[in-house]
Amino acid sequence: LAANGEVWKGTGGETIRYYDENIANLDPQHQNENTKSLALRIAYGPFRYYCGGDAVGSLLDSNGEKVNIEEKVGEACGTVDVSKANHHAYKDAMTEGFLRHIQAKQYVIPVWDHEHIQPDVIQRMVTMTADKSDPVVYVTHMPQARQEKYASESWMQSVSPVSGHVVIKVFDEGRKYSIYVLSAEDERCLVKAVYGPYESGNK
């Protein structure tokens, strides 16, 4: 979908090289590695999975207007079943525009810092997800202090109560998938929780 600021247009082999659109994008003071993130959409049968690294930030187009790279990547990607959150779902990520394009049913947030638990962002992810019957958000680590602080927040009801390694198991030739949460305290990777199976195909 994207790499080094070059984003697929969504059909055929055409791309837009946003760093070439405006010379100001090449100014070292405005260089941002996040806009250069590699973004992938993985397909197996009807199942779709998105992973976009730290794909956030803006670049200038030929008219000097700001272009949100995350939203352009989401537009190229289209709807998916499961999405890894961009940039740890930090406050500059998972914009409304991006979420509207991918319409994922579940999101995985890789967390290694307390600040990666951003209430406004998670609330937005939960609110813009149609199916809330099961956990919508899976975090690799939920700091105890954050869990206690936000325990009464409505969005916490849509966050998996267990955290750890998140594994997506796709089967039946891509028609179904389950989400496993494994222990991350040591190398045993014990199964802590299993969610699903879910039907693939986000319409």
What residue ranges belong to the model's regions?
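Flexible, acidic/histidine-containing loops and adjacent segments that form or flank the divalent-metal
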Residues: L1-S62, T129-K203
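Cap/insert and terminal regions of metallo-dependent hydrolase folds
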Residues: L26-S37, V56-S158
